[in-house]
Amino acid sequence: SEMYIRDRGTMGFGFPAAIGAKIANPKKPVVCITGDGGFQMNIQEMATAVTQGTGITICLLNNNYLGMVRQMQELFYGKRYSATCLRRRPSCPGGCKGPNDQCPEYVPDFVKLAESYGAYGIRVEKEEDIDAAFAEAKKHTDAPTIIEFMIATDELVLPMVKSGNPMSEMILK
């Protein structure tokens, strides 16, 4: 079975749903695809995932933003960005256009975070490392594996549907 909720569900729902799916179907592979912001909505559930021995794979798309919110602000609100940059600090300049080399380091380090829970963490920064990351994650059936994909800050997640619109008005490009 496949279940896709992208932009049709509550932010942060994917990870706890994946835990439930794995507990209900322990012999089936379960993959959760989530963003860095959404994952942090229920990050404490990593303790449940570890103590229950779920070998789920979490594909965490890290763009240093609340990406879906930023994407809606870009596409539907004239690029008027508000409260979406996860590297923003009070010391950032007022006209900052988002993460750059002057920004503080992004926290948390998801690989270290996974390891601190007793789970596994892998960071992917180059496309050619994807297959090896999934091969490694498949080996871990005793605890979750976070595969953190470092992606461009302005990468759009498509297809998507504007809030309140029907699926027939899906944006494809």
Q: How does the language model describe each region?
A:
Residues 6-173:
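Thiamine diphosphate
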Residues 1-5:
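Short, small-residue-biased leader/transition segments that mark boundaries at the very start
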